[in-house]
Amino acid sequence: MKESEYRNNSQEENNAGNTDGIRNENLEEKKTEKDIEQKEDQKLEEYGQATLEDNEGKRKIHLLTIIGEIEGHENLSSNSKATKYDHILPKLAEIEDDDSVEGLLVLLNTSGGDVDAGLAIAEMIASLSIPTVSLVLGGSHSIGVPLAVCTNYSFIVPTGTMMIHPVRMTGMVIGASQTYEYFEMIQDRILSFVSAHAKIAYDQLKRLMLNTEMLTRDLGTVLVGEETVKEGLIDEVGGIKDALKKLYELMETASS
């Protein structure tokens, strides 16, 4: 074989090898992208969480949904939609530790649930160092009220509702003065948190909680849309575009 022919053959083999290498790299990249998409889809389906980053500024926002009933230490029925605090709390810690996440958007449509679990989630969100915005959709009742006001800024849709009522307890209740005092302590924790993170006074919030004129079989008050803003619970009436716009503004201020 001539030297020139040998050189040409070697060059063709090198080119073929490079082509195969590029093809393999492209396949690996596509596989990685597909794996990431599958993980995101699974995270959205199982936990109601997603990452929003396809915006103009490529700002990374974590989307957290709080829906159904806030599950406590006992598992709810498999037929019930529930938010599990043991899923939410570790994720919030991960968000705080991740420098790439610049903001948190919380969507709420909850009937309430376990007081300790709800307050734990609310305290975690309130203590995050990144900008946070909440949006109440269908409703945010009972322990959902602290969850709605724990962010830096809150929105509610015009037809959204919030119910404020005294603490309820299931199971056996001992008819003693100590039980009443325990209920009062639990209510004080809720009232103190809400009044500290919203524009409503403690006494006014307690009056709404103990209202006897609205509900036929319970104490409490139901507020709709604009009423929550007038009472000082929620900052503004708006939808998803308003919530995202406000979050971008807070993120811009935080980064400047």
State each model region's role.
Residues M1-L135, G139-V145, C150-H165, M169-S256:
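N-terminal organellar transit peptides
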